[in-house]
Amino acid sequence: MDAQSAPSGQVQVRFTTRNEDLAVGDTPIFVPTSLKRYGLSQIVNHLLKTEKPTPFDFLVQGQLLKTTLDEYIVQNGLSTESILDIEYIQSTLPPAYLASFSHDDWISGIQLTSDTILTSSYDGIARVWDKSGEIKFQSTGCGSSLKSASWHIPNQSFLTASLDQKIFHWVIEEPESMLDAEKKSSGILQTLFVGHKDIVERVRSLESSSVFISASADNTVGIWDFERSPETTLESFSSSISKKRRRKNAEFTPQAGARSPLILCEGHTGPVMDIVFSDDPSVAYSVGQDHTIKTWDLITGQNVDSKITKAPLLCVEKLTDLHLVICGSSARHIVVHDPRAGSDKIVSHTLSGHKNLVSGLSASPENPYMFASVSHDNTCRVWDVRATSGSIYTISRAEKTGSQWDKLFAVDWNKSIGIVTGGTDKQLQINQSSSFGKSE
């Protein structure tokens, strides 16, 4: 009997899950082929014998089931005489739009804490926002557009990376009295880090370490230390700031002077676009326009592994619990890579759906399988690596500019604020749902 002759028949299915707490056993059972997601969810809940039903989504051969089983079987040329393996995952609600905060120029970087949003912009200014949209701190513009920002100590100090090859370390000073409590915090330019010979595309730091890392268009990865990086002169920095502006703004002189990198790591043959720490803070992964994913020993500065992919890579993020690295490419897809020693696959699989290059990635703060991406197609997409057929949700811009050229550059995602995105429309957009991103 085939699916064509028995569209309302039955098929044997084997329900599977990667969450042991929700497992129902692997014994195949017969179910009507007329069932969709809701009917299958009822069956799984019945097998689980839970007091409160849990909504589930279902994956068949990596595809989210959006039709009846019968339609899926017919469309994919399968037989009802074979056992159909169906993976179930907890459903999530679409991320709801909450708010947008306006910038004066393009938004290039975003990093969240539990109650603040750090942004970098092409106007050369870094801003710290609270969740209501109030600017709590604003850095002084240093004469060049910013490409990236990273908290060192949340709500106390952060780094910015610029088009003019520099990295700035800012320290936030809180108001001294209750009378000043409603004013913006003031800031100190603490240290200038110099050494790259081209745009610093990305800077990343960890609160638990004095070491931070950078990716540059000069084909190098920078390893720096707030305490151990060698001191150097301020001449090149001073020459880029006009005398009038230096007299007017004492903030332009870094209080702790300038420092050079511990190591500039060579190995990429094209611009390095992004870098991320591994779970081991002495290891990092970088990606570049030379199509490669490289693994670095941050103690020695050595490139310990390199994988070549089919397209230039523009951004990178880690999925900690899965021991995977995801990379956004100029070919519009997302590469899922296993960097562990002994993994002989260059690419585990790819995820497709964006209509332009993928410019930013951020892992879900709660669900180990999920992450968000942004693209020059001006959308943010939410993915589950188990669903290989495409993204789960697409988040469009809430405020339309009417320009077909708008692009998104940056995304970050945490539990307390949500998914925050920004780009050429100058809008910092926040999307969140109370149950969105819940881990299984």
Curated annotation (Swiss-Prot):
Protein name: Ribosome biogenesis protein ytm1
Keyword match Translocase: no
GO cellular component: chromatin; nucleolus; nucleoplasm; nucleus; PeBoW complex; preribosome; preribosome, large subunit precursor
InterPro entries: G-protein_beta_WD-40_rep (IPR020472), NLE (IPR012972), WD40/YVTN_repeat-like_dom_sf (IPR015943), WD40_repeat_CS (IPR019775), WD40_repeat_dom_sf (IPR036322), WD40_rpt (IPR001680), WDR12/Ytm1 (IPR028599)
Pfam family, one: WD40
Record HAMAP family: WDR12
Span list, region Ubiquitin-like (UBL) domain: 11-90
